[in-house]
Amino acid sequence: MNALNQAHCEACRADAPKVTDEELAELIREIPDWNIEVRDGHMELERVFLFKNFKHALAFTNAVGEIAEAEGHHPGLLTEWGKVTVTWWSHSIKGLHRNDFIMCARTDKVAEVAEGRK
């Protein structure tokens, strides 16, 4: 079991440090199914989850929303028929914080038990 999926987010302010290159290299190994994307000049973590239909995709979206609310850290979510794209980044620092990796791992944990996964 991944230690990240047991961790909790810390408050992240605009002056919080982004992950270093060394931290990035270490943390990304713990969430191997996630991709680093660069948008608007900052890094984001993104993964696409496939489902059998819209109902299952929407249920997963809502489950991710629940963990986001509980941690006070919110992703970008795009819900389509049979597909959910989840994107984590720290808006306040315009980049990646340890919180984003924690939430990727927690999203993976939700996906493990999600109904209707392809």
UniProtKB/Swiss-Prot annotation:
One Pfam family this sequence matches: Pterin_4a
Keyword Lyase carried by entry: yes
Entry-linked SUPFAM superfamilies: PCD-like
Keyword annotations from UniProtKB, A to Z: Lyase
Family to which the UniProt record says this protein belongs: Belongs to the pterin-4-alpha-carbinolamine dehydratase family.
Reaction(s) this enzyme catalyzes, per UniProt: (4aS,6R)-4a-hydroxy-L-erythro-5,6,7,8-tetrahydrobiopterin = (6R)-L-erythro-6,7-dihydrobiopterin + H2O
PANTHER family named among the record's database cross-references: PTERIN-4-ALPHA-CARBINOLAMINE DEHYDRATASE-RELATED
Gene Ontology biological process: tetrahydrobiopterin biosynthetic process
Name of this chain's protein: Putative pterin-4-alpha-carbinolamine dehydratase
GO molecular function terms listed in the Swiss-Prot or TrEMBL record: 4-alpha-hydroxytetrahydrobiopterin dehydratase activity
Family annotation (Gene3D superfamilies): Transcriptional coactivator/pterin dehydratase (3.30.1360.20)
Entry EC no(s): 4.2.1.96
